[in-house]
């Protein structure tokens, strides 16, 4: 990564970060982070969220957490929407260059911690049927398949892809992130 890229991805909010692991930190996402988050999103997906999508989520009070590397670079993020006794995981993304290093698991664990603190009983999400690595992460964390949303995601120029709907019941014990 070049110096300009590194500075563009650098953390910028004022809240003190929380330790996620020996080499990573967590903190809330804020408006100053949107350029870096949007860059990661565009590098990770063929149909990424826009800067406006992220800005709307922040303005709407959605839960939005960042995962930072030891040198302060944003390496991933998670966004969720709180509901009545449940939370909908909307977006969990790790920069492609640092995927498969446990960062997604750390972000998912942080969201689960926040959801439990609220007293929510369920965490649910949609995931592309073609996204086997994400499905594996969610299943290892205790999520179960509960349905299918046909044509949920855009795919290609005019196509659509089905979404697998998954749920994690938080009222019990023994799930993969305990």
Q: At which residue positions do the language-model features occur?
A:
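Generic short amphipathic/hydrophobic targeting helices enriched at N-termini
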Residues: 15-18, 123
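Short glycine/proline-centered loop/turn elements that form peptide/ligand docking sites
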Residues: 108, 131-134, 151-157
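Conserved GNAT acetyl-CoA-binding A-motif
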Residues: 115-126, 137
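Conserved catalytic-core motifs of GNAT/GCN5-like acyltransferases
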Residues: 126, 139, 144-165
């Amino acid at each position: 990564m070049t110096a300009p890229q590194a500075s563009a991805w650098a953390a910028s909010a004022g809240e003190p970060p929380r330790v996620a692991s020996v080499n990573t930190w967590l903190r809330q996402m804020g408006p100053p982070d949107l350029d870096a988050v949007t860059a990661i999103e565009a590098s990770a997906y063929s149909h990424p969220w826009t800067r406006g999508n992220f800005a709307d989520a922040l303005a709407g009070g959605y839960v939005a957490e960042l995962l930072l590397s030891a040198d302060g670079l944003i390496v991933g993020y998670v966004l969720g929407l709180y509901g009545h006794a449940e939370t909908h995981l909307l977006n969990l993304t790790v920069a492609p260059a640092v995927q498969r290093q446990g960062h997604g698991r750390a972000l998912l664990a942080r969201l689960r911690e926040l959801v439990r603190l609220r007293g929510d009983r369920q965490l649910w999400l949609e995931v592309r049927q073609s996204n086997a690595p994400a499905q594996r992460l969610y299943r290892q964390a205790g999520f179960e398949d509960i349905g299918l949303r046909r044509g949920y995601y855009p795919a290609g120029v005019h196509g659509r892809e089905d979404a697998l709907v998954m749920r994690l019941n938080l009222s019990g014990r023994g799930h993969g992130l305990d």
